[in-house]
From Swiss-Prot:
The lineage of its organism: Eukaryota, Fungi, Dikarya, Ascomycota, Saccharomycotina. This is Protein COS6. Residues 64-69 are extracellular. It is found in: Membrane. It holds the Pfam family DUP. GO terms for cellular component: endosome; fungal-type vacuole; membrane. The keyword Transmembrane helix applies. The chain crosses the membrane at residues 43-63, 70-90.
């Protein structure tokens, strides 16, 4: 027991030291009013934006020298409307290219600072890389990464997921060349920190539900699941879509009578799909929420449908107490909870292909397998 307490104290000390270090760092999110103003500043400082602005000089000369105003007008309109599109595309490609050339340094910073899945651990990494990119002329400003979360997301999309999906060493060398050993070392450090976080999180039982005996699932409060779904998807964000639909029905006379109800059906299915995806996006804001979900599945004593009902109750209470969800109705019942795990966790793991706007959860693969194994054992028991 004393050894475990000492290990936990050491891990807590490490976390506190990392938080103190992150407090000293200054990132663009601390300097700019918002991410939009930061993005505008980055665009303004980019070479492609300056080239676009310089294009107006020969165009203005052409306007003065030309006798026919039609051709200068057409070219000016093209530059005016399509210019910003090309600026944005080339700007994003240049960011991607600059980052791909600095993968080795990216990995060295990860190995040095040992960040975990907590976004705060990435603040030092983001600040150091911002300075390195600017000093070594890899980027023309000191603000490549806006925040620690953007740095962590870049690590996930540039290194973690692409490298983990490579099947053999030859494919890794072909894609990442000389950076392979540095990437392997960085991923090993990252996975070690995530494992520490999981063990600490799973052993301390940092959260336990209180008064769960009185908790009820939404299936007990609503007569039909459709009622629960409609309540979730019919909110203020849907108001513009409904106004558009009412405009088509009552004002426009060009639409056929069949198209109107068909539009409503399609709209309903789109909103239902977005609601399902939104739940996973909300859960993915913090890794600890996903870890809590997997830990709850693994540690559940009940089996079968009753077990999933208990998991749904615990997660509904947890997400409400952590202010992730506005009420205790995240999961409708155990069946909905089981579908959520199978669809957003195990299916992604089996296919090893990310869904739109959702990550692969590479660092959670061992725990997803463990959760699936515990579910299989419970079903056989």
């Amino acid at each position: 027991m004393k050894e475990n307490e000492l290990k936990n104290e050491k891990s807590v000390d490490v976390l506190s030291v990392k938080q103190l270090e992150s407090q000293k760092t200054v990132l663009p999110q601390d300097l700019f009013r918002s991410s939009f103003t930061w993005f505008c500043y980055e665009i303004y400082k980019s070479l492609v934006f300056r080239i676009w602005m310089l294009l107006w000089l020969p165009l203005s000369v052409w306007w003065k020298l030309s006798n026919n105003w039609i051709y200068p007008l057409m070219v000016s309109l093209l530059v005016l409307f399509w210019g910003p599109v090309f600026v944005l595309v080339i700007f994003r490609l240049s960011r991607k290219r600059s980052l791909s050339k600095q993968l080795t340094q990216f990995c060295k910073e990860i190995t040095k600072n040992t960040p975990s899945s907590d976004p705060h651990d990435w603040e030092v990494v983001a600040a150091n890389l911002n300075s390195y990119f600017y000093e070594n002329k890899a980027w023309n400003t000191k603000y490549f990464f806006f925040s620690a979360m953007s740095c962590q997301e870049a690590f996930r999309t540039t290194l973690l997921e692409p490298f983990s999906l490579k099947k053999d060493e030859a494919a890794k060398v072909k894609s990442f060349k000389d950076s392979v050993p540095y990437i392997e070392e960085a991923l090993e450090v990252y996975f070690t920190e995530v494992e520490k976080q999981w063990k600490l999180f799973n052993s301390e039982k940092s959260w336990s539900p209180v008064g769960l005996e009185d908790a009820k699932l939404p299936k007990e409060a609503y007569r039909f699941k459709l009622t629960w779904v409609l309540k979730r998807i019919f909110n203020r964000r849907c108001l513009p879509l409904f106004l558009f639909y009412l405009h088509n029905v009552f004002i426009s006379r060009n639409d056929g009578t069949i198209a109107r109800p068909l539009f409503l059906v399609v709209l309903f299915f789109i909103m239902t799909r977005d609601f399902r995806n939104m739940r996973m996006i909300v859960l993915s804001v913090k890794m600890e929420h996903k870890m809590q979900f997997l830990s709850t599945i693994i540690n559940e004593q009940e089996s079968g449908a009753n077990g999933w009902d208990e998991i749904a109750k615990k997660m509904n209470r947890y997400l409400f107490e952590k202010k992730v969800w506005k009420n205790e109705e995240f999961f409708f019942d155990g069946i909905d909870c089981e579908w959520f795990f199978s669809h957003f966790f195990y299916r992604v793991l089996s296919a090893k292909k990310s869904m739109r706007a959702l990550s692969l959860n590479v660092e959670l693969w061992p725990y997803i397998k463990e959760a699936q194994l515990s579910c299989s054992e419970e079903s056989l028991a």
